[in-house]
């Protein structure tokens, strides 16, 4: 039988995270969970009590900052721990506020029928994202301006980008790599997971002090390799990852009104479920989904 590794990055909404863990509690699943070190207090025992059949491995918490290299490092850590733990047929990266809109049975059937593919999303809308790679983005971890100290360093980091533009700095000027971008979540095979880890030093060198490149580093490596020929749907980043995302809602959240659409969808995962009615929505979804 197939075996999955679910790699979960969480930082809030532990009520939703518990529902996610309960949903993934299947003997065929190994669940690798990283919780941001900056997260509010939570009860680890309560999380462990959600699991009876699967294996739950909670990684040592590190601070993860939005848009910062720490996001990439966290993904690599999850891949490292999960590939060393066991051989899995697929590694699924999920956020803590993401949820399967199909049952584990359905999801396993889908991947058994499609095990030749890599579920990585590509989007070629524009080359604007190259700005994220051209300059040094220092002090990204202070960009949320939580206090005076962060405001000071965050402000300096912010001012350094136009200065670099003025000075003509371009980190990728002589780089022959074709950079690609796409949806940040994916489902990948064991060989691709190992391939990414073999390139860890190169990833660090290239993407440290860049901005929001968790949507770039895997796509770029896959595009330059034979794995690109196995991508499920290179023309649609969400279909290729079997994910649903909402842009209609100002906070990109799903609500009760979206239930019929979620049930009708052929996708496997959706995000985000972190609105006021998220628990009610997930409960109804679980009752009625395939």
Region locations from a protein language model:
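ER/Golgi luminal nucleotide-sugar-dependent glycosyltransferases, focusing on the catalytic module
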Residues: 2-290
């Amino acid at each position: 039988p197939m075996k999955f590794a679910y790699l979960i990055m969480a930082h809030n909404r532990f009520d939703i995270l518990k529902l996610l863990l309960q949903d993934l509690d299947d003997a065929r699943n190994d669940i690798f969970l990283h919780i941001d070190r900056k997260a509010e207090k939570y009860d680890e025992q309560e999380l462990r009590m959600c699991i009876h059949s699967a294996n739950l491995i909670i990684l040592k918490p590190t601070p993860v900052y939005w848009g910062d290299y720490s996001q990439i490092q966290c993904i690599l850590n999850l891949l490292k721990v999960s590939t060393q733990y066991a051989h899995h047929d697929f590694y699924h990266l999920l956020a803590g506020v993401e949820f399967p809109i199909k049952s584990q049975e359905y999801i396993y059937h889908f991947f058994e029928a499609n095990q030749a593919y890599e579920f990585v999303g590509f989007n070629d809308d524009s080359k604007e994202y190259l700005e994220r790679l051209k300059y040094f983005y220092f002090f990204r971890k202070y960009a949320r301006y939580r206090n005076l100290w962060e405001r000071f360093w965050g402000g300096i980091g912010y001012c350094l980008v136009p200065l670099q533009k003025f000075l003509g700095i371009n980190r990728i000027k002589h780089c022959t790599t074709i950079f690609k971008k796409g949806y940040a979540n994916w489902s990948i095979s064991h060989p691709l997971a190992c391939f990414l880890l073999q390139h860890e030093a190169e990833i660090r060198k290239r993407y440290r002090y860049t901005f929001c490149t968790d949507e770039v580093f895997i796509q770029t490596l896959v595009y330059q390799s034979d794995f690109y020929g196995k991508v499920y749907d290179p023309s649609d980043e969400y279909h290729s990852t079997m994910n649903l995302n909402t842009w209609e809602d100002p906070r990109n959240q799903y609500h009760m009104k979206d239930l019929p659409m979620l049930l009708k969808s052929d996708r496997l995962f959706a995000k985000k479920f972190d609105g006021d009615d998220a628990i009610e929505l997930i409960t109804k979804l679980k009752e009625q989904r395939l």
